[in-house]
Regions:
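Acidic, Ser/Thr-rich peripheral helices and adjacent loops at domain boundaries
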Residues: 46, 54-55, 225-233
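P-loop NTPase motor catalytic core
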Residues: 2
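His/Asp/Glu-rich metal-coordinating catalytic cores
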Residues: 5-9, 14-197, 204-210
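Terminal amphipathic helices with adjacent charged low-complexity linkers/tails
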Residues: 34, 199-230
């Protein structure tokens, strides 16, 4: 599992039941965020579903969690004739790219990724010495147009040739001028984040750009913040 954004895990419990003997790997942070979202915050089921359906979905999610094997980042391990290394993908807490090596193949796969460092979360990192023959990228969610994507790709390739990871300063958010304008008018600003992991981006953004502005959290947002704090963020 590359990372724990809901569009990547919402149907995973159902999919896992179709492959009952498949081994499922993830980082510790990804596994924890899956548990928080699907079980503690109830995102495994819809509001209009019957209790029987909800209970079955929870059972599937619990089974999925018990099957997830935690693997460390940047430490190669062996599995079924393959050498596997999980590499930081940026993007969110726990997100990784997967580097697979066999006798005849070298494949680098990534789910969503971020090239730049932003709001306390480092960008993707491809160490020196990794030269895949096949590169599988999930590029639509990098939020770049073709010209910008080409520029970023050139920078990553340059960093790889130099044997170093590539990171850059935090991006400016379109929220900043909107919030500043409202604060200048002595208005209160109400922000909503429907994604549990993206709450961390929002909290880092507010702390970095508006360090002297009081921030009040609703009970559910406070629970999310406490969960992230317990994870060390």
């Amino acid at each position: 599992i590359s990372h724990a954004h809901y569009d990547h895990i919402g149907s995973f419990a159902k999919i896992a039941t179709l492959a009952p003997h498949a081994e499922i790997l993830a980082t510790q942070d990804t596994k924890h965020l899956i548990e928080v979202q699907l079980l503690e915050f109830g995102r495994i089921s819809g509001r209009e579903e019957s209790e029987r359906v909800k209970n079955e979905r929870y059972r599937q999610a619990q089974t999925l969690l018990s099957r997830i094997q935690v693997r460390p980042v940047m430490k190669t391990f062996q599995m079924k004739g393959c050498k596997i290394t999980l590499l930081p993908a940026g993007h969110m807490i726990g997100a990784v790219m997967i580097y697979l090596e066999t006798e005849s193949h070298r494949i680098l796969y990534s789910g969503d990724f971020s090239v730049k460092t932003r709001f306390g979360l480092n960008g993707m990192r491809i160490p020196g010495g990794i030269f895949p023959k096949v590169l599988l990228l999930n590029a639509p969610n990098t939020y770049l147009d073709a010209d910008e994507w080409q520029k970023e790709l050139i920078l990553v390739q340059s960093a790889q040739r130099e044997g170093a990871g590539f990171t850059e300063g935090a991006e400016q958010s379109g929220l900043e001028p909107i919030i500043k304008r409202n604060l200048a008018q002595n208005k209160r600003v109400y922000l909503i984040s429907k994604s549990i992991p993206k709450n961390l981006d929002l909290l880092y953004f507010l702390n970095e750009v508006f360090p002297d502005t009081p921030v009040f959290l609703e009970p559910k947002s406070r629970k999310i913040a406490d969960t992230l704090a317990d994870m060390g963020y």
